[in-house]
Amino acid sequence: MKKTTLIILAIATSFCFGFAFKTIITKQSDDQTKMKKVTGIGGIFFKCKDPNKMREWYQKHLGLNTNQYGAVFEWRQGADTTKKGFTQWSPFAETTKYFEPSTKDFMINYRVENLEALVEELKKEGVVIADKIETAEYGKFVHIIDVEGNKVELWEPNDIEYEKLGKQLGSMTTK
């Protein structure tokens, strides 16, 4: 009887430890996956000869609600449809230095989660981090350089503050 009880206790203990370790390992894997998760497109930025004319043309012919920075598209987040998300569309002057060191006429902004941890992971992987993380009321930003030399903007958004800023500027979103 004592031997059977000890065997059952040993099996139960092994099962519990195994379950606990699996949970810890799975959680770490989930955290690592989450750390690198791009949640969407935060912005499309491109060079043009005359940003004002470009904004006017897109407003007139395609109905974009433009402001001094371009247009903001409002959408609902897939993971939680009660939350809004935003994507910025911005024409830049062809002489802008903002896209440097890239020589391309465009830059894409990706929405991400946990920017600090992501940057640390990217550093370990040898990805070129072009600058330091900057923090604004509406989110955190950093630039990286991809494999073809394109400057890429990573944004951990604060959508609530971003929406407030848009309202303060009198900007309407394109839906």
Task: Kindly label every feature range from the protein language model.
Residues 1-32:
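Bacterial Sec-dependent N-terminal signal peptides
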Residues 92-98, 162-163:
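A short, acidic/glycine-rich surface segment
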Residues 22-49, 68-69, 96-175:
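Vicinal oxygen chelate
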